[in-house]
Amino acid sequence: IRYDRPYRKCARIVGDTMGKYHPHGDSSIYDALVVMAQDFKKGRTLVDGHGNFGSIEGDGAAAMRYTEARLEKLTQDVFLSDLDKNVVDFVPNFDETEKEPSVLPVRIPNILVNGADGIAVGMATSIPPHNLGEVIDAVKAYMKDNTISVKGLMRYIKGPDFPTGGIVVNKDDLHKIYETGSGKIRLRGKVEVEKLKGGRKQLVITEIPYTMLGANIGKFLNDVASLIETKKTTDIVDISNQSSKEGIRIVLELKKDTDVENLTNMLYKKTRLEDTFGVNMLAVADGRPETLSLKQIIEYHVDFVFEITTRKYHTLLDKELEKQEVQEGLIKACDVIDLIIEILRGSKNREQVRKCLVEGITEGIKFKSKASEKAAAKLLFTERQANAILDMRLYKL
């Protein structure tokens, strides 16, 4: 399911995942896949979905037998690169028939970029998403100066960046939230005023609080309709939801001479056009759940990237040293090529040759002379060098 290969049926992906790694039912796997493909829920989608993957109004995705998916390029490059270079440990899967990475060698703090939410026994986490560029800039700033404060990091990360947009009302509280890892963010929808013919106006909502996602959009429309029916406002003539794949567009057509500011404030007060997002930056750190500050999350991430980068280059170095060892052995073999061919001709099997090349044991090998046998006993190639010589075709030798 690489990004540069054709889409694959989601039913196949879910089946493979359940059979190899997650024997706990297909619905939870498919739900997770769908969320990772929804750009209105994730700041950066990790799955490239093809087909009906639901809508911002809360419509569900089509059944997995109809939809297709593959990885986004970002996922391939940032989450899965260098897995073949021993950057993380591999552990057996649930039935010990496969190996799987204990963690993915992700090169960005995805917990900040895409946020996280979930519940467990006695604990819950709720981390808002942030702008990828801002997060990377903050990580770079920490790497230059690891004594930087949360306030210093906030010069780069201005605040949450929700995929649905919205305006943070209590910006002054963000420092405390990022310092302690918990708090509440007050969000407002973005309202624009458009002028119509005849001096009339309409309010257009182009961004909504993240908490208004899904069925809550319909609830907002019902709440506005209820305000009209109960005559708590007489300024709204019509309401329509014109949202599409291009984005949110909820239109409130107004009477002439409506006090737009008063009406907007009433909508903030009486509906979910203003709402709170609870923050609890709980994560598993060193095997234990811990509420982390913004700086701690970045610190853990940088330490992790340092670890996987160190492991990567240790692996590459080991491979180059092995290659060097083999090349040195082949160079040495070139100098005694006639003797090696004599050993090959005089031996009965591969093991005899190996013992002669590595340990200097000449027993059972027929030599042309005692001098040759004496020289063969002093070759002393390494095990790796001997195998390289034995694996090489004679014409190459």
Q: Model-flagged regions — what are they?
A:
Residues I1, C10, T17-Y21, D161, ...:
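Long, charged, helix-rich clamp/arm modules that form nucleic acid-engaging surfaces
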Residues I1-G181, R249-V251:
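Catalytic phosphate-handling regions of large nucleic-acid enzymes and associated NTPases
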Residues Y7-K9, R44-H50, N114, G183-V204, ...:
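Flexible hinge/switch segments at interdomain interfaces of large molecular machines
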Residues I29, T67, N131, M212-N216, ...:
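Short amphipathic alpha-helical segments
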Residues Y30, V34-M36, L46, G54-S55, ...:
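Structured core elements
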Residues A32-M36, Y66-L74, E134-V139, K219-D223, ...:
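Alpha-helical scaffold elements adjacent to nucleotide-binding pockets in ATP/GTP-utilizing enzyme cores
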Residues K73-T75, F79, L83, K219, ...:
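Long amphipathic alpha-helical segments
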Residues E192-I239:
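Long hydrophobic segments that form regular secondary structure
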